[in-house]
Amino acid sequence: MSERFIKNIKDLKFKPFDNYGKAIEGMNCHKISYDKKNGGFGTYILKMEPGAKSLPHVHQGFEEFYVIDGELQDVDGKIYKKGDFVTFEPGTEHNSLTKNGCLLIVFMRGINKPI
């Protein structure tokens, strides 16, 4: 029989977000099923503190996220708000920032590459 894991978001233990080889200031994650060893497939919760900014990167596979709380602004000015579900197709290049902080659940299908 397979195992089942249940976590309440209030009980998560966040660690520095280091998907590009080094921690990014103001970005922390809790990996649920995400693993680079399986090709970067899986899910994690991402917490971005006010003023945090992701590195510019290109998507090797699909990346989707749901904004649980706060707002996230993409480099092109598009703002994603609480309740938005966003899909990036393979080949998409971008980076994001948050003025007031945000909490996302991220679904990855492939490892992003910094540019």
Task: Please provide the spans of the model-predicted regions.
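Short glycine/proline-enriched turns and hinge-like loops at secondary-structure junctions
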Residues: G40-F41, V58-Q60, K78-I79, T98-N100
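Short acidic-glycine-tyrosine-enriched beta hairpin
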Residues: V75-E93
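Glycine- and acidic-residue-biased ligand/ion/polar-headgroup-sensing regions
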Residues: H59-V75
